[in-house]
């Protein structure tokens, strides 16, 4: 799970490393950071380390936006169908027609979130900056948040980092100095 540990995200991060109990008495486990030295010092040692903190600044945000754009452009990302299409498809089935309203809402929620992500992305535009090498996005209408886009972009960034780590590990394991040639038959 990726958390922006700048600004308000610090409060969320602080709470994530502590066990939580809700009003009904249900206890939720604490989770730890795998990459943040500050949290590694203060979080309990025995908790699952599934959190990844990003402290985004102007340069990193530019790289994150560029990566998201690249992955969208080259077809690396596939989205669910939008909420309206999913609702029509679901109601066209007998199973969907027999669902209670609550079941239907639960089943369509991922599609609703996809639709909201599209709306947020449509509300963003490139912002002119003095440094033309940086990608900066601004909201066209400030009433619409960009939280889902940010979560999407940070997730894509973390995927890129994991892929790069795997590639480096694979490259490191190959025999140094030995060329690996692959031959194909003509066709």
Give names to the regions the model predicted.
Residues 18, 85, 138, 168-169:
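Flexible domain-boundary/linker segments
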Residues 127, 145-187:
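Acidic two-metal-ion nuclease catalytic site recognized across multiple nuclease folds
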Residues 130-142:
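Short, solvent-exposed helix-loop connector elements
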């Amino acid at each position: 799970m990726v958390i922006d540990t700048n600004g308000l995200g610090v409060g969320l991060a602080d709470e994530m490393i502590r066990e939580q109990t809700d009003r009904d008495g249900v206890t939720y486990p604490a989770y730890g950071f795998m990459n943040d030295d500050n949290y590694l010092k203060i979080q309990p040692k025995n908790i699952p380390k599934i959190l990844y903190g990003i402290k985004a600044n102007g340069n990193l945000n530019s790289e994150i936006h560029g990566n998201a754009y690249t992955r969208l452009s080259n077809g690396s990302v596939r989205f669910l169908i939008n909420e309206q299409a999913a609702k029509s498809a679901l109601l066209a089935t007998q199973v969907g027609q027999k669902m209670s309203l609550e079941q239907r809402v639960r089943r369509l929620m991922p599609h609703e979130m996809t639709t909201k992500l599209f709306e947020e992305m449509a509300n963003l535009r490139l912002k002119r900056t003095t440094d033309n090498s940086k990608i900066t996005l601004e909201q066209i209408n400030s009433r619409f948040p960009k939280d889902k886009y940010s979560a999407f972009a940070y997730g894509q960034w973390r995927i890129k980092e994991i892929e790069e780590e795997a590639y480096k590990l694979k490259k490191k394991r190959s025999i140094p100095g030995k060329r690996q040639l692959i031959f194909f038959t003509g066709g």
